[in-house]
Design a protein with these regions (language model features):
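Bacterial N-terminal signal peptides that target proteins for export
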Residues: 1-10
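Hydrophobic helical h-region of N-terminal Sec-dependent signal peptides
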Residues: 10-12, 16
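N-terminal signal peptide c-region/cleavage motif recognized by signal peptidases
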Residues: 18-20
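N-terminal secretory signal peptides
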Residues: 23-64, 115-124
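Compact alpha-helical subdomains of small soluble proteins
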Residues: 54-124
Length: 124
């Protein structure tokens, strides 16, 4: 029965190793990721459909991240959502079409609503 001793010793050692604490997402994380995705979509569509009238959506995303001060994991998820939004529309459009312009209008409305909801529900 000697082989059980090393296994027990290994189990005891594993139990003594500190486990890093898992970060808990804030309750608005899902909405933030959706907002990041929308901003990425707008970052792609704006130069196609409304190049002179829109703000720099990438800078808006950077400002949002700076304001929220997420940990590295959340920061990467927000950046991933932004990139996913950009990529989704980059696969669909090469020029501004009626559909692209309509998508941009809907995205602007959704971004405004999402930002307002996050602020009204979670701002201090």
């Amino acid at each position: 029965m000697r082989p059980a001793r090393p296994i027990r010793a290994l189990l005891v050692c594993l139990l003594l190793v500190p486990v890093p604490a898992l970060a808990v997402d804030p309750p608005y994380q899902g909405e933030m990721e959706r907002l990041a995705e929308i901003l990425g979509s707008l970052y792609f569509l704006a130069p196609l459909c409304r190049p002179s009238s829109e703000p720099d959506w990438r800078q808006q995303m950077a400002d949002l991240i700076e304001l929220d001060q997420p940990d590295d994991d959340r920061r990467q998820r927000l950046a991933g959502a932004f990139n996913a939004g950009y990529g989704a529309y980059a696969r669909l459009y090469r020029a501004c079409t009626v559909s692209a312009d309509e998508a941009m209008t809907r995205l602007l409305l959704e971004a405004e609503k999402t930002a307002r909801d996050i602020h009204s529900r979670f701002a201090e």
